[in-house]
């Protein structure tokens, strides 16, 4: 029976080659940009141009790139993901803060249609003057109400499929799915690596 990856020892060179292959950098493993995003679950997305380059390195076709959105699904960090996945991953991994529940209703009212950051900042300054703007954006995205989308990266209200719609509310199944995607695209890796990443 094969041993789990965590108990196998690789040289640095072997590990590097295996990771390049699992990340789709030696051959193109996926047809489209959305296929890449779905395979990874989420990809670091702070720098929009870098994440777009990362997707284009791994896919043959980019016509479905509009299905890639950005939000805050985990680790208080901006990630890119498929519109089909960011909702359940956010619900599974985002950690709410005290006071966010009360703030959510006010933030939701601010974003009824796609807005630029400047437009949302202006609305938030009037409606929620005591709340830092970055917190408004994060609450909107961590609650699954909005994502950055489109060529202009507008803050866009969305109705995302969550854990209930995708996994019948089963967090164990959702965690197993996210873990499977992680190991297939980041391996060789350990359970500790996954726990840090998620």
Placement of each model-derived feature along the sequence:
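Phosphate-backbone binding and catalysis cores of DNA-processing enzymes
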Residues: 1-115, 122
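Acidic, low-complexity intrinsically disordered regions
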Residues: 26, 84, 130, 192-193
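Short amphipathic alpha-helical segments
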Residues: 103, 116, 132, 174-175
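Flexible, glycine/proline-enriched loop segments at strand-loop-helix junctions
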Residues: 110-111, 120-127, 166-169, 181-182
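A short acidic, leucine-rich amphipathic alpha-helix
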Residues: 116-125, 191-195
């Amino acid at each position: 029976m094969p041993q789990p990856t965590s108990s196998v020892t690789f040289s640095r060179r072997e590990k590097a080659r295996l990771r390049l292959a699992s990340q789709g950098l030696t051959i193109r493993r996926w047809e489209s940009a959305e296929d890449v995003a779905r395979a990874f679950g989420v990809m670091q997305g702070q720098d929009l141009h870098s994440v777009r380059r990362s997707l284009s390195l791994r896919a043959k076709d980019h016509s479905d790139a509009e299905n890639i959105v950005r939000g805050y699904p985990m680790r208080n960090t901006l990630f890119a993901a498929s519109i089909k996945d960011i909702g359940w991953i956010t619900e599974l991994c985002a950690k709410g803060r005290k006071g966010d529940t009360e703030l959510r209703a006010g933030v939701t009212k601010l974003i009824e249609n796609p807005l630029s950051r400047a437009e949302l900042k202006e609305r938030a300054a009037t409606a929620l003057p005591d709340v830092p703007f970055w917190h408004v954006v994060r609450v909107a995205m961590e609650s699954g109400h909005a994502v950055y989308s489109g060529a202009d990266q507008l803050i866009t209200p969305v109705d995302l499929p969550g854990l209930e719609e995708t996994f019948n509310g089963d967090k164990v199944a959702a965690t197993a799915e996210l873990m499977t995607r992680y190991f297939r695209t980041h391996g060789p890796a350990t359970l500790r690596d996954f726990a840090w990443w998620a």
